[in-house]
Curated annotation (Swiss-Prot):
<dbReference type="GO" id="GO:0008180">
    <property type="term" value="C:COP9 signalosome"/>
</dbReference>
<dbReference type="GO" id="GO:0008237">
    <property type="term" value="F:metallopeptidase activity"/>
</dbReference>
<keyword id="KW-0539">Nucleus</keyword>
<protein>
    <recommendedName>
        <fullName>COP9 signalosome complex subunit 6</fullName>
    </recommendedName>
</protein>
<dbReference type="InterPro" id="IPR033859">
    <property type="entry name" value="MPN_CSN6"/>
</dbReference>
<dbReference type="InterPro" id="IPR000555">
    <property type="entry name" value="JAMM/MPN+_dom"/>
</dbReference>
<comment type="subunit">
    <text>Component of the CSN complex, composed of COPS1/GPS1, COPS2, COPS3, COPS4, COPS5, COPS6, COPS7 (COPS7A or COPS7B), COPS8 and COPS9. In the complex, it probably interacts directly with COPS2, COPS4, COPS5, COPS7 (COPS7A or COPS7B) and COPS9. Interacts with the translation initiation factor EIF3S6. Interacts weakly with RBX1. Directly interacts with COP1 and 14-3-3 protein sigma/SFN. Interacts with ERCC6.</text>
</comment>
<dbReference type="Pfam" id="PF13012">
    <property type="entry name" value="MitMem_reg"/>
</dbReference>
<dbReference type="GO" id="GO:0005737">
    <property type="term" value="C:cytoplasm"/>
</dbReference>
<dbReference type="Pfam" id="PF01398">
    <property type="entry name" value="JAB"/>
</dbReference>
<dbReference type="InterPro" id="IPR024969">
    <property type="entry name" value="EIF3F/CSN6-like_C"/>
</dbReference>
<dbReference type="InterPro" id="IPR037518">
    <property type="entry name" value="MPN"/>
</dbReference>
<keyword id="KW-0736">Signalosome</keyword>
<keyword id="KW-0963">Cytoplasm</keyword>
<dbReference type="GO" id="GO:0000338">
    <property type="term" value="P:protein deneddylation"/>
</dbReference>
<comment type="similarity">
    <text>Belongs to the peptidase M67A family. CSN6 subfamily.</text>
</comment>
<feature type="domain" description="MPN">
    <location>
        <begin position="38"/>
        <end position="171"/>
    </location>
</feature>
Length: 324
């Protein structure tokens, strides 16, 4: 079930989403109609937002992030279903994509999502600029006619701050120049995505509105633990002050503190030991399976390379035999 991006936000209009600033004319093609129809899944937007937030938290400032878009394409209809992060380096103020990292990630995703193909790339920031053209040309070396999705996390508009582009070649001053043409898109959701998006929508930044049941339960637990910590800290400070002679002994308070300590569950029971060892075994088994999987992958790569080398040597021997 799909709805237009504007309708999903309660606003009209089916053309591309607005951004804070005017689009840079030098990289945008005017009067060009999109050649493909794009359906965008909310999971992609959530992945990009999560990627940007994590990088901002790590670096302490807003950072531009880059990733790959994967999905399905049938003729002129493109469905962007998922995404993954890409590594990049800055050389002389130009972004260079780590293609080896991309090929590794693509191989991993192909093992899980065999039906999904690489469709394009995404980044964050304002309107498209020449640096985006530079990165887009690198992506064109991997796939022909890739999509370009840009999310503006700093916008203050109520519309969805996502724009999708395709590249076109135009003649400017007698030279072939790559430009971006904006595409219209729709939001396509599946049942699992609708549940996840509904949960995120309930968790507002201001705390107003209806919160999810899980969030309310965690907030109540956090408040209770915070209060317990403050009370235990107060009792501990009183006991230390009594031992140091700073305050007089109050045997009634000390007896209540002693009784409170004995109310706590004893963690040396057989059931606790059994559950504890079971959990330790589960964690160790997961780590062991991960190591085995990594070792199998290494062995598989070694066998593939060995087979390639063996085949080359066999071909060489057969070719030499022809001359005799």
């Amino acid at each position: 079930m799909a709805a237009t991006a504007a309708a999903a936000n309660g606003t009209g209009g089916s053309s591309g989403m607005e951004v804070d600033a005017a689009v840079v004319p030098s990289v945008m093609a005017s009067g060009v109609t999109g050649s493909v129809s794009v359906a965008l899944h909310p999971l992609v937007i959530l992945n990009i937002s999560d990627h940007w937030i994590r990088m901002r938290s790590q670096e302490g400032r807003p950072m531009q992030v880059i990733g790959a878009l994967i999905g399905k394409q049938e003729g002129r209809n493109i469905e962007v279903m998922n995404s993954f992060e890409l590594l990049s380096h800055t050389v002389e103020e130009k972004i260079i994509i780590d293609k080896e990292y991309y090929y590794t990630k693509e191989e991993q995703f192909k093992q899980v999502f065999k039906e999904l193909d690489f469709l394009g790339w995404y980044t964050t920031g304002g309107p498209p600029d020449p640096s985006d053209i530079h990165v887009h040309k690198q992506v064109c070396e991997i796939i022909e006619s890739p999509l370009f999705l840009k999310l503006n996390p700093m916008t203050k508009h109520t519309d969805l701050p996502v724009s999708v582009f395709e590249s076109v070649i135009d003649i400017i001053n007698g030279e072939a120049t790559m430009l971006f043409a904006e595409l219209t898109y729709t939001l396509a959701t599946e049942e699992a995505e609708r549940i996840g998006v509904d949960h995120v929508a309930r968790m507002t930044a201001t705390g107003s509105g209806e919160n999810s049941t899980v969030a309310e339960h965690l907030i109540a637990q956090h408040s209770a633990i915070k209060m317990l910590h403050s009370r235990v800290k107060l009792i501990l400070e009183y006991v230390k002050a009594s031992e140091a002679g700073e305050v007089p002994f109050n045997h009634e308070i000390l007896r209540e503190a002693y009784a409170l300590c004995h109310c706590l569950p004893v963690l040396s029971t057989d059931k606790f030991k059994t559950d504890f060892y079971d959990q330790c075994n589960d964690v160790g088994l997961m780590a062991y399976l991960g190591t085995i999987t990594k070792t199998c992958n290494t062995m598989n790569q070694f066998v593939n390379k060995f087979n390639v080398l063996y085949d080359r040597q066999g071909i060489g021997r057969r070719m030499r035999g022809l001359f005799f």
